[in-house]
Amino acid sequence: MKKISRFALSIILLAIAGKVIIGCAPKAITKGEEFPLMYEETPLTILIMPPMNESTAADAKEYYATTVQEILSHWGYYVFPYEITADILKMEGIYDAELVRNIPTSKFREYFGADAVLFTTIKKWDLSYMVLSSTLTVSIDEELKSTKTDQTLWKYNGTVVVDLSGGNAGGGVAGLIASAVITAAQTAMADYVPYAKQANYRALTSLPFGKYHPQYLTDQSMQFIDQTPK
């Protein structure tokens, strides 16, 4: 059997490595391919439901709920004022976001005139803290459902991970102490709301634009990374 030269072996290994990298690379898809129902139904008005909270932070729902409406409006949709609709739901005895999931979406069309309903789930709203480092993670699942058919028109995940560590404060024990103090201070002052907005923005990059956006019905070929919750 002939020996394989080092050069030939290198080429083979590079080819195999290339296939592995390509296979592991995030999949890019288009809005039109992934969310065809958005272009068929073309919803104009969206009703935001109170978020479901699966994180360990009890106050996550209250903070996160303030971050959704503005970004959706910038995407070209008419969005019902969240605080008003949330109060109406409370007056109807619906205090818990989990209860909303059991209501047929057609009811929201009947009562509010909404074309679609946005359900959000807070998956992570967490601080991971160690002496010299800490990480802030905000992760949101979002799903838009039709009030005509109850079908899912769009769903996606937005996640933001922020390093709050103190960085390099010099060498030795003094440097370690300084880094620990900086990390503790930055962790204590961490504000989730801006990062929740970032998570929303990352999710909405895959949402087709609404009627009041200049690119309405022209973004079918726009690509994004597939992070749709399975």
Give the label of every model feature segment.
Residues 1-25:
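Sec-dependent bacterial lipoprotein signal peptides
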Residues 2, 32-35, 103-106:
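A generic local structural motif
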Residues 24-44, 147-230:
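C-terminal/domain-edge helix-coil "capping" segments
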Residues 43, 55-119, 151, 155, ...:
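N-terminal segment of the mature soluble domain
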Residues 46-52:
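Conserved H-X4-D acyltransferase segment
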Residues 48, 72, 120, 142, ...:
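Buried hydrophobic packing residues in well-ordered domains
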Residues 53-56, 85-88, 123-128, 160-163:
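Solvent-exposed loop/turn segments at secondary-structure junctions
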Residues 97-153, 163-171, 175, 218-230:
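Surface-exposed short loop/turn segments
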